[in-house]
Amino acid sequence: MYFRLLIFYIFMFMACTPNDTSNSSAVPLRSEIDDKYKWDLTKVYPSDEAWEEDLKKVKELSPKFADYKGKLLSSSANLLEAIELSEEINQLFGRLFHYSANSLNTDLKNEKYQAMYQRVRNAAIKSGEYSSYYAPEMLEKDYSVVESFMDSEPKLAVYEKSFKDLYLDKPHTLSENEERILTMTGKMSG
């Protein structure tokens, strides 16, 4: 039985091995592909330099989120400012990741884009450390506080579902220190 299986696999291997080993059927290099078939990442960033500027910007903005620690729910204005800052940071990270990941996906051997992807990943981990207090601090107060803030500041009403989801997850939310440690484990995972 073993011998028959071995013969079967040998014949299958031979049948699947191409006869023509020339490069004529090889996957073309990216430089050989017509531009109309390539991602146009210039719509995300016109250049790597523009990407660098936004990475610098997100690294400057991220620590500012920590300024709201301990006073996040002291007023509706503070909560709104913190959320708007968080949104700005998250939008920047979205673009930064999209550009670096898709640039890397065009050539996984490209060390420049490997480094860019790793740099934005590290910046996101660091940003997560600055914001690790957010959920635990929000959940220290009753949801009625957030509801009153939404009543007094109409711009907060668009975040109602996010607030409700956060409070629904309260039983599964870690302390600030545990959240920070969990965020920091991203440094070890890749």
What function would you assign to each model-found segment?
Residues Y9-T17:
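Hydrophobic h-region of N-terminal signal peptides that target proteins for export
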Residues C16-G190:
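A well-structured
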